[in-house]
């Protein structure tokens, strides 16, 4: 897989958690702008490591960086100009006013994404393949 800046850090969150926050916002008497975020950031590199762990591709005792290098090629052409290195939101106001907090952590989110993609891939490979036009 070709990726750009593996050190870029993002506030990765689960859409279902954000939908719960949006619903809570809509229940307020007066509209208020809230930051909805996990409050923690993880690098693209950490994301890749979690994906590889979820797929059991990092053997016990293995050099993690070496395993990552087997699967990922960093392509400088994919780096964003003017990229903000660390994007992390502060959802303190939403946590307080809406009594909201994210339920799915980073590892859980990655695991859900991997399992979802594995299910999609399994469904696609189970479909009959036709030669020619359908």
What spans do the regions from the language model cover?
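C-terminal substrate-binding subdomain of Rossmann-fold SDR/epimerase-dehydratase oxidoreductases
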Residues: 1-134
């Amino acid at each position: 897989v070709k990726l750009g800046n593996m050190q870029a850090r993002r506030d990765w969150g689960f859409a279902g958690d954000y939908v719960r926050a949006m619903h809570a916002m809509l229940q307020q008497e007066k509209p208020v702008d809230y930051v909805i975020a996990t409050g923690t950031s993880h690098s693209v590199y950490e994301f890749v490591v979690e994906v590889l762990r979820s797929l059991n591709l990092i053997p016990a005792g293995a050099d993690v960086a070496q395993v990552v290098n087997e699967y990922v090629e960093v392509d400088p052409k994919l780096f964003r100009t003017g990229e903000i290195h660390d994007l992390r939101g502060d959802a303190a106001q939403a946590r307080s006013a809406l009594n909201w907090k994210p339920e799915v952590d980073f590892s859980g989110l990655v695991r859900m994404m991997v399992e979802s993609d594995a299910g999609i891939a399994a469904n696609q490979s189970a479909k009959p393949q036709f030669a020619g036009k359908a």
